Structures are given as C-alpha cells and as structure tokens.
C-alpha cells in the first residue's frame, strides 16, 4: 500500500511526504498511527487517550487529578496502579512538552470520547503564552464512507484525503470554547455543561451533540440509570429469555441502539 500510494501521489504531482518530519500528530488512541505511516506521513505521533467519558474528572491540581484518573483506570481496566500512572504521566508529559515552534495537528472525530479529550487539549493550549502552531482535523462524517464511526476505520488514502481537504488552523474561538467546556466538565454540577449544550457550540459544531450524549450517562431522575445501562437492560429484556453474551449485547448496543457510539469493547465491560 505504501508504494502504491506513493506512486499515485507522484503521478498526481503531489508531494510524497504530506507533512514534515518536525510535525506532531496528536490522537486519542493508536488507531491511525500505522495508517499515517503507510500514507507517507513523516511526523511524530503522540497518543493522548485518558478516557474522560468515564470515571471522575475532578477539578484538582495535576498530581491529584492523575491520582484520581489512575485509580479509576485500575478499577475499570486490567492494569496495575504503577502502569496506569506511568502511562498517564507519559501522555500528559508529551502534550506538556509541546510549545512555541512546534507544529501540531489534532486528529479527532465526533463522539464524546474524542470531543472531551479535544476540549481538554484545547483548554491546555489556550493557557500557554508560547503556543505551538495548531491545526486540526475534526470530522463527523466522511464522503463515501457509510456508517462512519471513527478515523481508525479509514484506509490510509482516506486519511490523506482528510489531510488535503479537512485540515484547518485552530482558531482563538475554538481554544476559548475548549477551555469553557473543560471548565464545565470538571464542575461537579452539570448545569453549566447543560447550558453549553443548549446554547450550541458553533466554533466546534460536533462538541454540543457529544456533550449532550455525555450528559445522558448521568443517572436518570426516574430510573437511576445512565443511558448505556438503560439501553443494555432494554436489549436483555427483548431477548425473550435467550442468553446473551456481553459481546452480543455490546454489538447490538453499538449497531442498533446507540445513536452516537463512543465506547470501545473494553470500556463497555
């Protein structure tokens, strides 16, 4: 694929290397790391994947915040406390190291997992006096891709298409909105987050729908259940006594019931 894509770019008169070696690609997971290499990208790759859509996101100083996040990750995933903390320290440290003179591209999609991480990154960069050159690809759909869920499902050639057609500079308005959203996310009272959703987020159009879905994970006043819990129980109730594995419940949830999928299988378990 790498040679074929390179040949096609040569024939089209496009540069073989879309970016440059001094560029840094930031993504909330590793799902496009290999595809970027196949597509010919030469820049460094930074993963920043603390899943804010789950667990406590308290308004604390960095050390205490990472303590809380590490404890949650250990409770929900098969990791030791040291491994969880070391990984978070490495990811946060890699982002903190980006500053003036760096060229950074943020790769994100439309679900609450991505958008909450995007908000945190924008909030972080908004506070810097010496800020890197920031660009972003943030999409909720891709022409010709039916059932688009995320960037990780895309062929390297489609990532190149996004690079050439969807790459845009990050604006001051987007940085300010990211800071506003992150401040609301870390507030134990969801009132401000709900206001942001109701007012809309024109600077980041995909943010408001993702935040709306995130708020629906809060316990319902009527049932005490978050939406994922309620949908999962609904799937079981419709099984007519048939035994369903967690895998089948997750598949049904993601393909037939969840309007804005954001959970991976490990996150669901």
Indicate where each model-derived feature is located.
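A structured, charge-rich N-terminal accessory region that forms the first stable segment of a protein
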Residues: 4-81
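Gly/Ser/Thr-rich loops at beta-strand to alpha-helix junctions
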Residues: 27-33, 110-118, 142
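A short alpha->loop->secondary-structure connector
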Residues: 42-45, 120-134
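Long, hydrophobic/aromatic-enriched structural stretches that serve as scaffold segments
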Residues: 76-127
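Short, conserved secondary-structure transition motifs
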Residues: 136-160
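A conserved mid-domain beta-alpha-beta active-site/ligand-binding segment of alpha/beta enzyme cores
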Residues: 156-238
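Short acidic, hydrophobic short linear motifs in intrinsically disordered regions
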Residues: 241-255, 264
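Short amphipathic alpha-helical interaction segments
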Residues: 260-269
